Curated annotation (Swiss-Prot):
PTM per Swiss-Prot/TrEMBL: Autocatalytic cleavage of USP1 following UV irradiation inactivates it, leading to an increase in ubiquitinated PCNA, recruitment of POLH and translesion synthesis.
Nucleotidyltransferase keyword on record: no
Protein's recorded name: Ubiquitin carboxyl-terminal hydrolase 1
Organism, scientific name: Bos taurus (Bovine)
Start-end of Polar residues biased regions: 7-16
Ranges for domain USP: 81-783
Biased composition (Basic and acidic residues): 45-55, 250-273, 284-296
UniProt gene name: USP1
Biological role stated in the UniProt entry: Negative regulator of DNA damage repair which specifically deubiquitinates monoubiquitinated FANCD2. Also involved in PCNA-mediated translesion synthesis (TLS) by deubiquitinating monoubiquitinated PCNA. Has almost no deubiquitinating activity by itself and requires the interaction with WDR48 to have a high activity.
Listed GO biological process terms: DNA repair; monoubiquitinated protein deubiquitination; protein deubiquitination; proteolysis; regulation of DNA repair; regulation of protein stability; response to UV
PROSITE patterns, per database record: USP_1, USP_2, USP_3
Length: 783
């Protein structure tokens, strides 16, 4: 190689293999450079296309186009609060909206919450006891569902009231977050952990079942407390009877001493004046002593009662004054507790004197005299209503000359308590009767079962389609099935034959029988579950779950009567007030919405506490979320939900600005902005604390002198506290604003609330075709 380099001959240059290598290297280098040039050209082209696309996007979707959407939202914003979707929680939001508008549910939850708040205070006092630690944790976990429901109800009512008073504060949407209730459900049932889609009927049964268990737990504790109270009352009565017996003995002793004095002064014997049967004071001589003794015996037998009445005027005040001087505190505590005595027991001397009205008590204001009274009244105050305590006539310390009233022990009024404890039983729970009739001996056997919902089919079974006999269905076969047909399938007469024969106790062998299902007790609200999901015959289900959707339409009436399937004749009729719709293909996918009819607004009673934003309630007040909690919550969303990260380090892009976030679609067409922005607006006390009517503001400013100082003083007074007239004006304004929606149907799609016409609602309820959105749960209330 060193000899080849300096050579300049043409032959060597032509036959040199190194020259070919150089050419080959140059060839590869040209290819690489060409690729590099092509790559740079493509980058330039991409930059040009990106610039072009960016300009095209800016022209097609300008930032100014989002403002009409906001204006349209502001005009169409309704005074009804929606619920934010927290990650596939449409099944929970639809059920909560129905329960919120269910008649009697909110008042029952509030009553239970008041009982639980008192129980929590009692449990805090017993926190140091180790034996009852597990019971406390279980009870507090079951109590938390009621507290979460009450917290959600308060937040919804407060948000609704603040919107009606200041609608300009809410421009985007009116919704709150059921996060506390969702966390409580996850603690009670781990099935709801995560962000999977669940069945709306299952979550309804879970909520009602836990409420029922809580009511039973409270009822057991109430019965136990009443038993403890009755034992205390019995102990007090025993002590009182023993004290009364001691008082009787003292009275006997004092009367004997007095009789001895009289007998000594008159020269009579002690036996002549026993047990109060004393004779008149007459002067007798020693000569007629024997004849007078016989007269005294006959007269004492005839005038025993009369002499007692005459001498009682002289003896009783002396004994009472002596008793007051010797034992004042003991006597006063006995008199105060006399209203607990039973009149069926043997009356004592003190009760006789009280019944005659001869005793006038002198009740002082000493504190140590009332210790027993206060202890008993505190125990009774926990379990009695105010009406029961008012009936008992206890004397005030200031009355010195009032007679003592001895009353019987009155039973504790537990009517309101029982209604609160039977919230689920009264509203949602009915009773079915399963009758089985033997076809040989015609004997009947009945079995009763409780129900909270009725599961009815939406189409005929395949076996019934094959068989042409339609003995089960009372109606002829039609293409469009009705709800009455579905209920008749539920309450149909079933004939037990073949291998499934019935063992009759009278016949002592297996016989053919007929079995029917009838309604014996009907609740206030009937929940009808339409069996829209069936096991799919496909071996592989791409959607998962294994339950496919049946989109067969079912004619659903607005009014319903179950007299045909009842055990006894009844005139009760039910009206449809809520429907939970499901749109989708399988049970593990799709979206739930709720349609509710707004009724009974004339009898609407709003809580005045919801108009006071600066509340100090710790248990029932909804807890606002700070920025850190919102970060953790939003980041935990699954892939199906749109996650929005709020952080100071990560700057948001120009394309995803605040206005475009509002148009991001969530589950089921939900168009909701970020939860943290909405909650900061809803939970801002400064904006809501200054809520007042425009008319009230004008009237208040007209009464002032027109100075800025008076205006500032009035604004500060409005923020610190509002007078009673302001409360009444606000409540009347809110009620009048809500009355506009009387009888209208509202569609709750998570955070969105819309008004639907009755015609459109009926078309969606009973469609002519087979749509993907069908009714799933029907709620009828008693008219």
């Amino acid at each position: 190689m060193p000899g080849v380099i300096p050579s300049e001959s043409n032959g060597l240059s032509r036959g040199s293999p190194s020259k070919k290598n150089r050419l080959s290297l140059k060839f590869f280098q040209k290819k690489e450079t060409k690729r590099a040039l092509d790559f740079t050209d493509s980058q330039e082209n991409e930059e040009k296309t990106s610039e072009y696309k960016g300009s095209e996007i800016d022209q097609v979707v300008p930032a100014a186009q989002s403002s009409p959407i906001n204006c349209e939202k502001r005009e169409n914003l309704l005074p009804f609060v929606g619920l934010n979707n927290l990650g596939n929680t449409c099944y929970l939001n639809s059920i909560l909206q129905v329960l919120y508008f269910c008649p009697g549910f909110k008042s029952g939850v509030k009553h239970l919450f008041n009982i639980i708040s008192r129980k929590k205070e009692a449990l805090k006092d017993e926190a140091n006891q180790k034996d009852k630690g597990n019971c406390k944790e279980d009870s507090l976990a079951s109590y938390e569902l009621i507290c979460s429901l009450q917290s959600l109800i308060i937040s919804v009512e407060q948000l609704q009231a603040s919107f009606l008073l200041n609608p300009e504060k809410y421009t985007d949407e009116l919704a709150t977050q059921p996060r506390r209730l969702l966390n409580t459900l996850r603690e009670l049932n781990p099935m709801y952990e995560g962000y999977l889609q669940h069945d709306a009927q299952e979550v309804l049964q879970c909520i009602l079942g836990n409420i029922q268990e809580t009511c039973q737990l409270l009822k057991k504790e109430e019965v136990k407390n009443v038993e403890d109270l009755s034992t205390k009352v019995e102990e007090y009565q025993k002590e009182e009877m023993s004290d009364n017996n001691s008082m009787e003995m003292d009275n006997m002793r004092h009367s004997e001493d007095y009789k001895e004095k009289l007998s000594k002064g008159n020269g009579k014997r002690k036996s002549d004046a026993e047990f109060g049967n004393m004779k008149k004071k007459v002067k007798i001589s020693k000569e007629h002593q024997s004849s007078e003794e016989n007269q005294r015996q006959t007269r004492s037998k005839r005038k025993a009662a009369g002499d007692t009445l005459e001498i009682s005027h002289k003896i009783i005040p002396k004994h009472i004054s002596e008793n007051e001087s010797t034992r004042p505190s003991q006597r006063k505590s006995k008199v105060k507790i006399n209203w607990l005595k039973s009149a069926a027991k043997q009356p004592s001397i003190l009760s006789k004197f009280c019944s005659m009205g001869k005793i006038a008590t002198n009740q002082g204001s000493k504190g140590h005299c009332k210790e027993n009274e206060y202890d008993l009244e505190e125990d009774l105050g926990k379990y009695e209503n105010d009406n029961t305590t008012n009936d008992c006539e206890l004397e005030s310390p200031g009355n010195n000359d009032m007679p003592v009233h001895v009353n019987e022990v009155k039973p504790i009024n537990k009517g309101a308590e029982q209604i609160g404890f039977e919230l689920v039983e009264k509203l949602f729970q009915g009773q079915l009767v399963l009758r089985t009739r033997c076809l040989e001996c015609e004997s009947l056997t009945e079995r009763r079962e409780d129900f909270q919902d009725i599961s009815v089919p939406v189409q005929e079974d395949e076996l019934s389609k094959v068989e042409e006999n339609s003995e089960i269905s009372p109606e002829p076969k039609t293409e469009m099935k009705t709800l009455r047909w579905a209920i008749s399938q539920f309450a149909s007469v079933e004939r037990i034959v073949g291998e499934d024969k019935y063992f009759c106790e009278n016949c002592h062998h297996y016989t053919e029988a007929e079995r029917s299902l009838l309604f014996d007790k009907m609740p206030e609200v009937i929940t009808i579950h339409l069996k829209c999901f069936a096991a799919s015959g496909l071996e592989f289900d791409c959607y998962g779950g294994g339950l496919s959707k049946i989109n067969t339409p079912l004619l659903t009436p607005l009014k319903l009567s179950l007299e045909e399937w009842s055990t006894k004749p009844t005139n009760d009729s039910y009206g449809l007030f809520a429907v939970v719709m499901h749109s989708g293909i399988t049970i593990s996918s799709g979206h739930y919405t709720a349609s509710v009819k707004v009724t009974d607004l004339n009898s609407l009673e709003l809580d005045k506490e919801n108009f006071v934003i600066d509340q100090t309630c710790e248990i029932g007040k909804p807890e606002p979320l700070n920025e850190e909690e919102v970060r953790g919550v939003v980041e935990n969303y699954d892939n199906e939900e749109v996650s929005i990260r709020v952080s100071g380090n990560n700057q948001p892009s120009k394309v995803l600005n605040k206005k475009n976030v509002e148009a991001i679609g969530l589950l089921g067409g939900q168009k909701s902005k970020a939860d943290y922005e909405l909650y900061n607006k809803a939970s801002n006390p400064d904006k809501v604390a200054s809520t007042a009517l425009p008319e009230n503001r004008n009237s208040e400013t007209n009464n002032t002198n027109g100075t800025d100082e008076s205006d500032s003083n009035k604004e500060s007074s409005d923020q610190t506290g509002i007078n009673i007239s302001g409360f009444e004006n606000k409540i009347s304004y809110v009620v009048q604003s809500l009355k506009e929606y009387e009888g209208k149907w509202l569609l709750f799609d998570d955070s969105e609330v819309k008004v639907t016409e009755e015609k459109d609602f009926l078309n969606s309820l009973s469609p002519s075709t087979s749509p993907t959105s069908t009714p799933y749960l029907l709620f009828y209330k008693k008219l």
